[in-house]
Regions:
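Hydrophobic alpha-helical segments and their helix-loop boundaries in membrane
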Residues: 1-273
Length: 273
């Protein structure tokens, strides 16, 4: 079938409705996920990317939405409900995909707080929000590893699979909002985010704590030495030295953290039969 025949098979308003409903999931996903922040690409660039990625699934979305047309009377209520469902799914998918990135950024914030550089804040180029120097550096490095390693293509395949599991033309079952395990699932992901943040930052934070303990002993036996003045340079030096070796390990383990999105998505699918 040629492109002209495909476009002529349905009325223009059917194509437009399918595009609005189908692209909402991808649009909200990219707005929520931190690796495609507002400061990296503007609205025009993001819209072009979403359009290019959406066209792959447009025939599938069109086949799901076309039976709902023409929308007469209460039909528009159904379309609005479907749009809200797509926004909800896009937000959940973007939130699950961003957990690994937010954990790395929070770990960098913990490290800066422990080494005494918590007041050194800057605007993160990816998200546009305020962040610490180490947090912004670790987040950007993780994003570079995410795209360079091919993890983005794998994640995009998982996003495309959701259009088959949860068709655009169907509402979510009420079981998602009535099952107690659904709320527990999101709580566990938040707990996992906090645990991963502590785990990533633990080596550098512990080294800074040991440096504080050593400086405390120095202050005990040499009270005339102003330990407060030298504590921050010492801890910054220790943290920077350890980051030279720890950064390679952090980037090597990034693939495992990226793969967690597939595991979380499979768990979330169990709540929506």
């Amino acid at each position: 079938m040629s492109l002209a025949q495909f476009l002529a098979e349905y009325e223009p308003h059917v194509h437009i409705t399918a595009f609005v409903l189908g692209s909402a999931r991808l649009s909200v996903f990219f707005m929520t996920a931190p690796f495609f922040g507002n400061a990296v690409a503007g609205m025009v660039v993001r819209s072009a990317v979403v359009l290019a990625l959406y066209l792959i699934v447009h025939p599938m979305v069109l086949a799901s939405v076309a039976p709902l047309m023409p929308a007469e009377g209460g039909g528009w209520v159904l379309l609005v409900a479907l749009l809200l469902k797509e926004i909800f799914l896009g937000f959940v998918l973007g939130w699950l995909a961003g957990l690994a990135f937010w954990a790395v950024e929070s770990a960098g914030l913990f490290i800066d707080n422990q080494r005494g550089a918590s007041q050194a804040s800057l605007s993160d180029p990816l998200s546009g929000d305020q962040s610490s120097p180490t947090g912004a550096f670790m987040l950007q490095s993780t994003c570079y590893a995410f795209f360079a390693s091919g993890a983005f293509a794998a994640m995009l395949g998982l996003i495309y699979s959701t259009y088959e599991c949860w068709p655009v033309g169907e509402l979510l079952p009420s079981a998602l909002f009535t099952k107690p395990g659904a709320a527990l699932f999101f709580g566990e992901r938040m707990a996992g985010l906090a645990a991963l943040t502590v785990l990533i930052s633990a080596p550098i934070v512990l080294a800074c704590l040991f440096a504080d303990a050593a400086l405390g002993l120095v202050n005990r036996f040499a009270p005339q030495l102003n330990v407060y003045v030298i504590s921050m340079p010492v801890k910054c030096g220790v943290a920077s030295f350890l980051l030279l070796f720890y950064f390679a390990v952090l980037m090597t383990d990034a693939a495992e953290r990226f793969a967690a999105f597939g595991i979380d998505l499979a768990t979330f699918r169990a709540f929506i039969p």
